Amino acid sequence: MRTNRLSWILVLSVVIFLVIINTINASDDEERLMVDVFRGYNSLIQPVRNSSELPLIVKMALQLVLLINVDEKDQVMHTNVWLTLQWHDFQMKWNPVNYGEIKQIRVSPDKVWLPDIVLFNNADGNYEVSFMCNVVINHKGDMLWVPPAIYKSSCIIDVEFFPFDEQVCTLVFGSWTYNENEIKLEFVQAELVDVSEYSASSIWDVIDVPASLVNKRSRIEFQVRIRRKTLFYTVVLIIPTVLMAFLSMAVFFLPTDSGEKITLTISVLLSIVVFLLLVSKILPPTSSTIPLMAKYLLLTFVLNVITILVTVIIINVYFRGPRTHRMPQWVRVVFLQFLPKLVCMKRPKSASERSAVRSGMAQLPGVGQFTLSPSAHHPLCPSADDRTTTIRNTASNETSAYYPLSTDALRAIDAIEYITEHLKRDEQHKSFRDDWKYVAMIIDRLLLYVFFGITVGGTCGILFSAPHVFQRIDQQEMLDRLKEKYDTASNIP
């Protein structure tokens, strides 16, 4: 039993010893390889034997990891990417057999020559990568460097269809000191941006990611085509603005004598000003085009200002009277006869018209039999017709023996005549005022229809003029399609 235990301990010790020996040998081989490879190596010299090997081919790829932010006001795109750079260094070659079958090594980037590929259109002054990772070198002299980077690149923002806008932002890479005769750029695989590790943004959808070589293959342009997700702006900006546009028409429903017409229009106007300030803070102050949302807010603002002016005119018309204004005949024809039929309004009958109807009803058969005859009146209480005749006769002959009246009675009759004339005049003035009020009501109803048509037409014409209003994008499906496109292009020789 004790012999078996000692045997296991001996075997385990031998295995551990061999592992340590192999590790030491591997470390020795790699250290020896590093010494041999970098003996006489100068990292400042471009890795070409002579000028006949120029230009040096540098292969490049870009992998989009995260779209951090797109600042519309400052016109800057903030991205997290992985760069891939490949080139050949003839000095970095060795035979793996001589170095323990080591086929690749990793070295610090300051030990080898690196192509000075920088982002040309950076927006923060940081041209280089943010983390200097190791360079992977294989035994054939092929160099691979995959540094991560966070870039802020300039991006010209097209705000014409905001918030239904698409943007095309470009990242331009190239050598800072070498010209097109010294370095040529190529793609590692496909002429696309790799989105296999991309994390979807909550604000933007990635539509396409093409790439191209420009300036005699001395630069590479990677394009990121993105489309804004509109749910947030629809709820926060578009729907309230549309509701305010239609709310401004409610002023034509309010009675003019309520005194709230101007209050409502001013309140809506102030709300529109607040939304205009909100849009101006989001978008860049460009003069090349007017944003879609700004156009709609401007239309609503202008309509509201016109509503205020028209409301003032309507209030002025509503409170006109016969002592200050006389209604022209054309106004009476247009606003009291023609337009009521056009806007489907019917004027209620006045008190005098209702009296005329009642008096007409008195002439119907069977109604006149209840009318008292003049002979039914008491001699001292004559009928209205007899009273008129009596008054006239009394004026010419005060000693009429037929109907003798006292002086007080004559004064009372004069007072009644004065009151009657005054009531008739008031009724006539009231009729004139009612005509002006009805004209104001007609203008209210007509402008309600006109402004409703303009608001509906403006809303549909402006908001629906964007080319992608009703298009919904499945971001995951789009990314899968771009990945498949990238893999297909990579497999093409």
Swiss-Prot record:
User: How does this chain sit within the bilayer?
Assistant: Multi-pass membrane protein
Annotated glycosylation sites: N25, N50
User: What is seen without this gene?
Assistant: RNAi-mediated knockdown causes a resistance to nicotine-mediated paralysis and small impairment in mobility.
- TM regions (residue ranges): 233-254, 262-280, 296-317, 446-466
Signal peptide positions are: 1-26
What GO cellular component is one of the record's annotations? neuron projection
Molecular function (GO) terms for this protein are: acetylcholine-gated monoatomic cation-selective channel activity; excitatory extracellular ligand-gated monoatomic ion channel activity; transmembrane signaling receptor activity; transmitter-gated monoatomic ion channel activity involved in regulation of postsynaptic membrane potential
- Give the disulfide map: C155-C169
Q: Name one Pfam family in it.
A: Neur_chan_memb
Topological domains (Cytoplasmic): residue ranges? 318-445
Query: Record's CDD domains?
Result: LGIC_ECD_nAChR_proto_beta-like (cd19032), LGIC_TM_nAChR (cd19064)
Q: Outline which residue ranges sit on the Extracellular face.
A: 27-232
InterPro entries per UniProt: Neur_chan_lig-bd, Neur_chan_lig-bd_sf, Neur_channel, Neuro-gated_channel_TM_sf, Neuro_actylchol_rec, Neurotrans-gated_channel_TM, Neurotransmitter_ion_chnl_CS, Nicotinic_acetylcholine_rcpt
Q: Does the record carry S-adenosyl-L-methionine as a key word? A: no
Q: What's this protein's family per the entry?
A: Belongs to the ligand-gated ion channel (TC 1.A.9) family. Acetylcholine receptor (TC 1.A.9.1) subfamily.
What is this protein for, i.e. what is its function? Answer: Non-alpha subunit of nicotinic acetylcholine receptor (nAChR). Involved in nAChR sensitivity to nicotine and levasimole.
Q: What is this protein called?
A: Acetylcholine receptor subunit beta-type unc-29
| Organism, scientific name | Caenorhabditis elegans
| Upper lineage | Eukaryota, Metazoa, Ecdysozoa, Nematoda, Chromadorea
Which gene name belongs to this protein?
A: unc-29
